[in-house]
Amino acid sequence: MPEPETLPTTVLTGFLGSGKTTLLRRALTAPALADTAVIINEIGEIAIDHHLVDFVEGSVVELPGGCLCCAVREDLARTLRSLIDRRAAGDIRAFRRIVVETTGLADPAPILYTLGADPMLDHCLHLAGVVTLVDAVAGAAAIDRFPEAARQAAVADTLVISKTDLAPFGPELASRLDGLNDRARRLLACTADDPGVVLFDGTTR
């Protein structure tokens, strides 16, 4: 019997102020995410195209573009297991991939560990990639000052440089990123009009 296909899972991270929430808000109603379950890190209301989606315990909201969205309750592993169980039972519409948003201060390492260490998640999911937003204005200073910002950049498969409309992607930030992670592809957020390109293209590990 062939092995069941696992769900590709993308981790979206970025330090405070990097524009991660802005990207996520655009992505949530994009056609590219119509078959995607997105796990956000904040419980409560999020404004999406003038709609307020109110997340309550256990809720999974289908957004206008067809994306399924829920908020982390208690811990990520439990949230992921619940989504997978409800998908298998037909309680929610089937999805083909998952995006996990981290908090701005999160070290991604424990999240990546969770995906591989939990037996059920390891059986049902695979890590497609890590996408990290880096602020062109304050990114170099954040990397120097905050270990979490450096770790977010270091584990990325894709580095998305944001706020290049306010400051160029200059040699200082480029040097920091080269020292931390010279293998990741780099995108400028202002030229990445399709959130699906940012989140999915080229991130398969």
Show which residues each predicted segment covers.
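Nucleotide-state-sensitive switch-loop elements of NTP-binding domains
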Residues: 2-13, 18, 22-142
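C-terminal accessory "lid"/substrate-recognition subdomains
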Residues: 151, 155-205
